[in-house]
Amino acid sequence: MSFFDTLQEATQRERHELFNLPIIVDALQGKVSLDSYRAFLAQAYYHVRHTVPLMMACGARLPTRLEWLRKAVCEYIEDEYGHEQWVLNDIAACGGDHDAVRDGQPSLSIELMVSFLYDLIARGNPVGLFGMVNVLEGTSIALATHAAGSIRDHLALPETAFSYLSSHGSLDIEHMQTYRRLMNQLQDPDDQAAVIHASKVVYRLYADMFRGLPRNAEAQHAAA
């Protein structure tokens, strides 16, 4: 079995728990409130703004034996640079206060997720950062592919309010193809273990973030 497939199998339970959260089920059906979508974008901003700094830190800490992976990190940084501004633009386009979000604080789960990743790079195995990529890009593909259009229609919002989510559908599908190839090149058991561990932690904390988002009152009533 390839390592990419091993990773998916090892994190199957965590992924199942995330995608079966009530608010994720709501999102995949397009049944989310404007408050829910704005809250999601705010938390997205609080982790997306760290993507490039985290990748830079990871690239700097990779050993020479993983020079091929450092090259991939550089390419990933180029693709991801500036995406936090897309999120702020979307917040403004759906009537939110992007200045308040930019100057605000993340939820505890996002604070812990970002802190865990910086600490993993600094004190542990920097390859583990690719566990984050597994979770966030896999989730964004599902939301962009199956939820963005129906949420936009349900909330009657312009396409300019979905630049982050919609663009990450096609972009992250391409990224995940590259990601699969990169993960299948990882041979060291310690590197593989670090990716699996980080993926499990990020799934847990990312799910906690979604649990903290406000739900659509109609969806809650229907589920009751």
Give a label for each model feature.
Residues M1-A224:
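Non-heme di-metal
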